[in-house]
């Protein structure tokens, strides 16, 4: 079984639980700097992952998979603040769960190539894939603004988290083990 995590950015993180091609659960955890600290946000992520591990009795034979933090995205330097935010979340996950479950990282282009058939696929492609194959997942998001019109968006973070979970079930365990990041 795979827990797929899209670290998104500091304000949004999505988690999926996938067994083979079966999507068992998914969640989206939002961060609001007005009501919580980044540490409290990381604790919410850990709490959700722990709940999934306990509910499905996951062990070292199962995996958490998250995206590798990239220093460059499409030839452009990533912002240091973004890199640090993602690295803190990864470090927290590794610290909390290394003794419990296998933890592997995957390059964004790698999972996109395996799941979507194109390593350079865009967010819209993962959304379209999930809407086609998992119509029970509502990816519609309404964002209300004080000074602008309401926006109607798609939750590409949840789509990516599900695709990452699917990736873990589509590749050989040896491939996942090559990219383990557990400290134990």
Regions found by a protein language model. Give the residues of each.
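Phosphate- and other anionic-substrate recognition elements at nucleic-acid/protein interfaces
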Residues: 1-184
């Amino acid at each position: 079984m795979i827990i797929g995590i899209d670290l998104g950015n500091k304000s949004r993180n999505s988690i999926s639980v996938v067994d083979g091609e079966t999507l068992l659960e998914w969640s989206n955890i939002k961060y609001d700097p007005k009501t919580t600290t980044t540490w409290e946000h990381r604790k919410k992520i850990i709490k959700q992952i722990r709940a999934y591990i306990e509910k499905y009795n996951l062990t070292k034979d199962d995996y958490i998979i998250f995206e590798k933090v990239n220093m460059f995205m499409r030839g452009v330097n990533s912002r240091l603040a973004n890199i640090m935010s993602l690295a803190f979340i990864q470090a927290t996950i590794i610290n909390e769960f290394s003794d419990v479950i296998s933890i592997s990282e995957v390059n964004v282009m790698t999972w996109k190539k395996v799941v979507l058939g194109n390593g350079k696929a865009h967010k819209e492609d993962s959304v379209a894939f999930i809407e086609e194959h998992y119509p029970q997942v509502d990816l519609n998001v309404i964002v209300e603004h004080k000074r602008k019109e309401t926006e109607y968006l798609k939750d590409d973070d949840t789509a990516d988290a599900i695709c990452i979970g699917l990736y873990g079930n589509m590749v050989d365990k040896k491939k996942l083990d090559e990219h383990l990041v557990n400290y134990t």
